[in-house]
Curated annotation (Swiss-Prot):
It comes from Caenorhabditis briggsae. GO terms for biological process: protein folding; protein maturation. PROSITE patterns: DNAJ_1 (PS00636), DNAJ_2 (PS50076). Keywords: Chaperone, Signal. It holds the Pfam family DnaJ. Transmembrane segments: none annotated. GO terms for cellular component: endoplasmic reticulum. This is DnaJ homolog dnj-20. InterPro entries: DnaJ-B11-like, DnaJ_C, DnaJ_domain, DnaJ_domain_CS, HSP40/DnaJ_pept-bd, J_dom_sf. One of its GO terms (molecular function) is misfolded protein binding.
Amino acid sequence: MRILNVSLLVLTAFLVDFVECGRDFYKILGVSKNANANQIKKAYRKQAKELHPDRNPDDEMANEKFQDLSAAYEVLSDKEKRAMYDRHGEEGVAKMGGGGGGGHDPFSSFFGDFFGGGGGNGGDEGTPKGADVTIDLFVTLEEAYNGHFVEIKRKKAVYKQTSGTRQCNCRHEMRTEQMGQGRFQMFQVKVCDECPNVKLVQENKVLEVEVEVGADEGHTQIFHGEGEPHIEGDPGDLKFKIRIQKHPRFLISVTGIEIIELKVDELVELLLEGIRFERKGDDLYTNVTISLQDALNGFEMEILHLDGHMVKVQRDKVTWPGARLRKKDEGMPSMENNNKKGMLIVTFDVEFPKTELTDEQKAQIIEILQQQGIKPRAYNGL
């Protein structure tokens, strides 16, 4: 009997803890408990597109999942609410006065009016639409490699109902008027409906633009219904076109040398030591300058990549000027499949010594290289 009572107490305590814990927001979003803000945003955005009620109007289960998803994002995207949730669960967040209810729909900050009112997503063909707005969004190569979210604050012009009425839906109609016996005249008149009056106001809007992992130059992110308003129809779309900036130099680290962050204004003389990536499709290209000594004897070095990891480059044979080394899966991630990456292609330049050699050193080089049989020859190198 005592064993049974103890078991019931344990079970009751477990159920109480389970109820107090509430929903597992990390599980709902499909992220780990140490996920960063960008990972949380990306997870929400991916699921919200599929579960939004306007896309699943008759699916009650999808609607419930979307409510849970919105509640999870509302809490985990807020630092204070997330900290409270991590300590005391959903009940703790509710006690602090907000969040977790699922009533807030952050969907529009990622997509605009994605489904409602036509919004550029298949509205009535006869419905007039405001002009689309296209904005160039300049991002770094690091942001395109790793993925990024850019918060855009803007003022949006919208029409709001006000007092009075106005003429609307105006069109031309043909009328017939009898001029006399057997005589008629046809003429065109302008006919309008009476609609509630509206005025143009400015609203503050915050949009989250996702720079997807592996984003391509020219890729466009569309926010439906966030463009120019139309007094008798739907607003146009707001489009952000990705423009990838030329990559600045980054540092290399020969084994045993600590990587330092250079300040350009203080260390201008070291500019030639910097390396930058150039992107072509999903491949990355860079040039590395090595000494003649390393070109002949071999070398080992590391290149700092766009996400902070080091790429080891090693040669144990002669490296000639213009030689290329290809590193598989060290290029850009594919936008369609982030698990696939292009090549990193390293081209080597060789820096020759600037000091003059003594006669003895020249004789030693001749003896070592044994290239007496190779004569200078001219060719068209253009």
